[in-house]
Design a protein with these regions (language model features):
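N-terminal strand-loop-strand
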Residues: 1-17, 45, 49
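Active-site donor-binding loop signature of nucleotide-sugar glycosyltransferases
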Residues: 4, 20, 72, 92, ...
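A generic structural signal for secondary-structure junctions
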Residues: 7, 112-113
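Short strand->helix junction
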Residues: 8-9, 22-24
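Unchanged
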Residues: 23-46, 56-111, 133-140
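Catalytic phosphate/metal-binding cores of nucleic-acid and nucleotide-processing enzymes, i.e., regions
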Residues: 52
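Charged phosphate-binding loop/patch that engages nucleotide di/tri-phosphates or the phosphate backbone
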Residues: 113-140
């Protein structure tokens, strides 16, 4: 997990999030995953799986975005220093206690449950989660 503490004017400031980033021109989701994992962690992923797509919406000035959610169970290399925050391997119990976006707990729970591929919509009003829809069914 990445503890976002190094970027200025960061909407994720002091939250724990997964690694990731924006697509570059002509990149597929898995190409973006491999590039971002290498850039942010120094690790080369050797085994991964796409687990779902999360749609983030907001009632504020941010337009929202789509996130392809992957898990990896194989990698090579050593963790390096990240310029966006502090990288740490964390246990599930410890992760549950860390500050993160409210909606992140929903998809983290789905990952821990090894749920099949899912579509999740998360709508925020500022920092507050106001709607969550999982596979077309409103859950919050």
């Amino acid at each position: 997990m990445l503890h976002r503490v190094k970027k200025k004017n960061d909407v994720n400031q002091d939250k724990w999030i997964g690694i990731g980033g924006k697509f570059e021109a002509d990149e597929t989701p898995d190409e973006c995953l491999l590039r971002e994992a290498k850039e942010e962690t120094g690790l080369t992923l050797t085994s991964w799986r796409c687990r779902g797509v999360v749609t983030f919406l907001t009632n504020g000035p941010w337009d929202g975005e789509y996130m392809y959610l992957f898990t990896a169970d194989g990698f090579e290399g050593e963790l390096k220093e990240c310029d966006e925050g502090d990288l740490r391997w964390v246990s599930r119990d410890f992760l549950d206690q860390l500050p993160k976006w409210e909606g992140d707990q929903i998809f983290l729970d789905l990952l821990w449950q090894d749920a099949p591929f899912f579509l999740l919509k998360l709508r925020y009003d500022g920092d507050k989660l106001v709607e969550a829809v999982l596979n077309g069914e409103k859950i919050r």
